[in-house]
């Protein structure tokens, strides 16, 4: 799953999410001191420490983490990833590039699954030939006057896409926890680990492993007999997981930076 890029479109949202979370928590205990809007704004502007963020984020009261949304862009992930990630609907909004309104003739590209990337060249060629054939047939259908929506059914699941995801901090943590588990598909794990890595860089406390990672990092596996029996270290941050589980991607990233 190379050439997948992620970016947080409103980095300021992380800071606002922390501030709103602390403010909402404080409000529950200071209602008797607020007589007017000026009092409320004084409470809103009160400073706070990272320890305060840590304490509140660890409480079983998710509502305080729902007063801000963080918007993330994903470029290059497949439409199969789109089908999987959009199962999450609570407090999440999506906007995707459209097969109906976009003409991919001559512009389409397809993602290469990590399992194919690791395989012999012969296997890689079989996969690439199959995807390219689908894209060629799509372009041929469009050239014959078939509308883009109908022709889109001929495209492969691996067709690269552009996706915007907007969610509350609490829901981001829920999605990351669910989708970075080693029982998920490689592409979904890679994308969500990349997103987590960016969120963690901006707020290592709010998105700490013990608050954001899969079940095995936050306690113990809850999959029972479906467990992978290969728990992730509780000390690992997202970059550590990427290095351990997807070393080929890391090597390619390092190589591209050198070039």
Q: What does each model-identified segment do?
A:
Residues 1-259:
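Family-specific signature for flavin-dependent thymidylate synthase
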